[in-house]
């Protein structure tokens, strides 16, 4: 990499200071961005349609997926506790 007129520090800074990519069509970028989203992420109000809000929006689909896993986990825990109590009574 030959960048004439720049010191080595300026070369490193110019290479590391890349702007954040905002591409809406790539699922890979959405997957990488989904790690930044948590339950504290507000639901965006600029989604085009309420019916596709949970399926198309990467933020909303990430939240929906986490809630779904939480409910599956809680249901499995209830079943396990029920089976343990049932075996203790027999």
UniProtKB/Swiss-Prot annotation:
What does the UniProt entry say about where the protein is found? Answer: Membrane
| Its membrane topology | Single-pass membrane protein
Please give the start and end residues of each transmembrane region.
69-89
Q: Which Gene Ontology cellular component terms are annotated?
A: membrane
Alphabetical UniProt keywords: Membrane, Transmembrane, Transmembrane helix
UniProt entry tagged with the keyword Membrane = yes
Domain of life where this protein originates: Viruses
Its family remark reads: Belongs to the IIV-6 466R family.
Name this polypeptide is given:
Uncharacterized protein 466R
